[in-house]
Amino acid sequence: MRPEQTARLEELSATLTSIEKVMDPEAVSERVRELEAQAGDPSLWDDPDHAQKVTSELSAQQAKLRKLNSLRGRIEDLPVMSELAEEEGDEASQELVETELKELGAAIESLEVTTMLSGEYDEREAVINIRSGAGGVDAADWAEMLMRMYTRWAEKNGHKVDVYDISYAEEAGIKSATFVVHGEYMYGQLSVEQGAHRLVRISPFDNQGRRQTSFAEVEVLPVVEQTDSIEVPDSEVRVDVYRSSGPGGQSVNTTDSAVRLTHIPTGIVVTCQNEKSQIQNKASAMRVLQAKLLERKRQEERAELDALGAGGNASWGNQMRSYVLHPYQMVKDLRTNYEVGDPSKVLDGDIDGFLESGIRWRMAQQEA
């Protein structure tokens, strides 16, 4: 290997060693064995909520172990790859070594960022709400594109997504959607996505082919656990049931299984229609309502701190990213200035760079 490549590889190896000390692969392996034993117990699914937590954590811990082992293996393999490239003596083989070194560096830096997540709720699963904003049918289409972006990111990273509710727009796209991304540290990673996302493109819905600017709002909440003490008395909740609907307002169910919960004291409304039964829809809607009430409580606490001069700006995420498809192609985070010149990759779920830069930016804001 060239001297600069050797130095870079040693640097990456040292970084990975530091990460391994934090993540503790032996402890992760032990936890995987414990969870596998629980998952193999036939009685596990007697409690579906607990079973979901066990299988989600097992998947996350296995993925964590695979990633650590893969990165360590790639570090060990790179000198061998370089030696073979030198024996080949062609430029293409040397370029492969350089490419692998760059990709390895990016992967290790990405993993390093997750070790920075130490907030009170960072390790939780995430509830994501997407709402179309200004821009008419284009905004509804944009909201659906954002939903696909996040679900594609989750799929690529091995995280299960449960869609709780989708409100379809009349012509195209969605008015709103609520879904949960399962897995450890999903809230910590995805919370930097909260705010207004702006799309600029030639509208496919405009007969004159004019450029259109559309907005959609992304809200990210931590999944509420029993330890959070977010109690919602039945007397404070109005429950309405109705038939699930699909695109164009078509009914997709013959029974009133969809559920709408209205929290009377705050006016917060939550709907869920994608579960199989009214009971399941009510339980899922209640989880989202609790998450919204927890976030409301946190916002009130932040507002009190702001009034005392001890807090930051609670609306930091607004107008946070622009996606420009015309007259040029660029996705840019307006907080971090991180940008990518290939919107198609970003919209297909390649958002790791934005998440990492957002997490680093947030840490810098908290330390300032």
Curated annotation (Swiss-Prot):
Keywords: Cytoplasm, Methylation, Protein biosynthesis. Methylated by PrmC. Methylation increases the termination efficiency of RF2. SUPFAM superfamilies: Release factor. It is found in: Cytoplasm. One of its GO terms (molecular function) is translation release factor activity, codon specific. NCBIfam families: prfB (TIGR00020). Residues 36-56 are annotated as: Disordered. Belongs to the prokaryotic/mitochondrial release factor family. The modification N5-methylglutamine is found at residue 250. Peptide chain release factor 2 directs the termination of translation in response to the peptide chain termination codons UGA and UAA. It comes from the Bacteria. Gene3D superfamilies: 3.30.160.20, 3.30.70.1660, Release factor. GO terms for cellular component: cytoplasm. Pfam families: PCRF, RF-1. The keyword Cytoplasm applies. Coiled coil: none annotated. This is Peptide chain release factor 2.
